[in-house]
């Protein structure tokens, strides 16, 4: 990542030093290889879309920030933050979904198809905050005045995730007119 512009755009070289980031790169490589192998002579648009860290309805998985916060708020468990200082591009689930629909509409209406294209749908720069800052925001705005137990675990081992993750969505904003609200 460029230290002068610490936001990943669609043209950044793919690759990562952690399994999660590498899995995201693999999706891009596999999609591009399918397009080139099976669809290069056809007028079919194949794109990939990347979103920030999506939060909101429908997220029932284990170790997820919003469901875990709500469980802690209801007294069902302590809130465990693995990496409280890590910065993520948080966005509400419907924001990138709107972008995906705008992208699908554009790709459907185009007369010529680009061989392969990636798109970012990311929050505003001010929404790139640390995990602990996100929780503090929840605490400030919560309806119930329950005191929740926050148990912070800082792992002193080899880093498995990127400390600061930011996406540049200028392409989506400029070409699609999309914006995170």
Regions inferred by a protein language model and the residue ranges of each:
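Heptad-repeat alpha-helical coiled-coil signaling segments
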Residues: 53, 57-59, 85-89
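Residue-level signature of the cytosolic catalytic core of signaling kinases
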Residues: 15, 23, 58-62, 127, ...
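Catalytic helix-loop patch of NAD(P)-dependent Rossmann-fold dehydrogenases
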Residues: 1-54, 61
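Hydrophobic alpha-helix immediately C-terminal to the catalytic Tyr-X-X-X-Lys motif of short-chain
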Residues: 26, 30-34, 69, 134, ...
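C-terminal substrate-binding subdomain of Rossmann-fold SDR/epimerase-dehydratase oxidoreductases
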Residues: 73-181
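Proline-centered turn/helix-capping motifs that create local helix->coil transitions or kinks
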Residues: 1-4, 38-44, 59, 74, ...
């Amino acid at each position: 990542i460029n230290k002068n512009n610490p936001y990943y755009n669609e043209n950044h070289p793919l690759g990562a030093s952690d399994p999660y980031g590498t899995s995201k790169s693999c999706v891009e490589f596999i999609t591009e290889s399918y397009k080139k192998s099976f669809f290069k002579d056809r007028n079919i648009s194949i794109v990939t879309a990347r979103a920030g860290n999506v939060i909101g309805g429908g997220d029932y998985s284990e170790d997820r920030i919003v469901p875990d916060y709500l469980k802690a708020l209801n007294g069902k468990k302590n809130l465990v933050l693995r990496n409280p200082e890590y910065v993520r591009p948080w966005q509400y689930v419907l924001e990138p979904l709107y972008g995906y629909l705008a992208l699908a509409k554009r790709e459907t209406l185009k007369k010529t198809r680009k061989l392969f294209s990636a798109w970012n749908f990311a929050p505003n720069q001010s929404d790139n905050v640390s995990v602990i800052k996100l929780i503090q925001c929840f605490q400030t705005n919560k309806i119930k005045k329950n005191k929740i137990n926050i148990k912070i675990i800082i792992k002193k081992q080899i880093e498995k995730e990127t400390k600061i993750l930011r996406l540049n969505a200028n392409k989506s904003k400029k070409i699609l007119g999309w914006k995170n609200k």
